[in-house]
Amino acid sequence: MGICASVFLLTSCPSGIKTGVKPSSVNIGSKSSATGISYNQKGGFQVDKKFSGQLTGPNLVFIEGGRFTMGSLEEDVLGMHDNVERTVSVQSFYMDETEIANVHYLEYLYSVQKDSTQDFYESALPDTTVWKNDLAFNDPYVEQYLRFPGFRMYPVVGISWKQVNDYCVWRTAAVNQQLAGSDKVKEKKPKKGAATAGTAATAATTRTNTTARLTIESGRVLPSYRLPTEAEWEYAAKAMIGTQQEDENQINQRIYPWDGPSLRQSQGKARGTMLANFKRGRGDYAGIAGKSNDGAIITTEVYKYPPNDFGLYQMAGNVNEWVQDLYRPLSFQDFNDLNPIRRNEKLDKASRYDSKNNNSLIDNKVRVYKGGSWSDVAYWLAPGTRRYLDEDSATATIGFRCAMISAGTNK
């Protein structure tokens, strides 16, 4: 009997794959399983047969997606009722292991200053005056925090939501250029006075030679770095994967990114030590000398405390983190239950908007931030809590980390 004579073998023969093996995204075969036409012939359809799965970008950790209960498990002490518990699912994705540190942002500023316009460089600078306070002597941080080597691995602060998105555009292009091996490509600096709109990627996108020849189809171009959605961030912070036993039933929920109600290590040699950088109470940022609680008066290094069960550091405390979502107090009513996000579009009936007498602080420019900071009490360390700020504003308590889709795989 010929190999292709049997009916049950016909489906595997045209693909050029070993008998009995079905084509997959990483083992596509030498021929189309739909037409039988060979791939990669001269003048024919080309596929990259070296593809073995999405590359993991620098600093990224894989987060296996799934179902979880989104929303705050803490008592709603402010009476906001803006994060009611509901069940949603998120697709697998990648997230930065740590918050973006000062040294990472300085790398970005160096590239922008070298390859972009002066106007855009100035617009990318963090607002270091966020440390100023009329009734507090924080002046040294204004000059030292961003650039002094002792703060290199402290989270960058004083950056707006818009600045963060520009950083993500640059980082995507810079990482893909590095992966393409085109570091030595000669670049052109934009002419003085050129338009600055959309120039976040100028520092990397002007490197067009090798990078431009790589396409999405090659599998060697990473998807875009971006801010995580609120659902992704909360899912990654809770890290309920650490509570799984024999089946998919979750017996316990988590208030914080770790088990239990305590903010201290409950066992081992580190028993009694703090698990996050936060403010214990009025005037108490770190305890007393010799018996420091969390070991940090302001922010601290991004690897300071133990990671959660996904391997992510500082998902509670240190600095709050921007997420993609627009803030709406009733987002839970509008959310899709798969990969939910709240965008700028108006979802309510037009009759419900009063454009003439709109005095609310909530508009299409306010963005959600989460996680709690060095200046927040423990209540805000719970992943389900949420606050908002104008996308053009910045504070000394908000930083960020990036995320990326996991294309074509859930594990």
Describe every region a protein language model picked out:
Residues 1-23, 236:
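Bacterial Sec-dependent N-terminal signal peptides
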Residues 13-39, 45, 49-50, 76, ...:
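Disulfide-stabilized, aromatic/cysteine-rich ligand-recognition loop
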Residues 40-56, 208-215:
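A short, compositionally biased domain-edge/stem linker segment
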Residues 55-72:
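Mature N-terminal segment immediately following signal peptide/propeptide cleavage
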Residues 58, 223-224, 306-310:
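Short loop/turn microsegments at loop-to-beta-strand junctions
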Residues 93-278, 326-328, 404-409:
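Active-site microenvironments of metalloenzymes and redox enzymes
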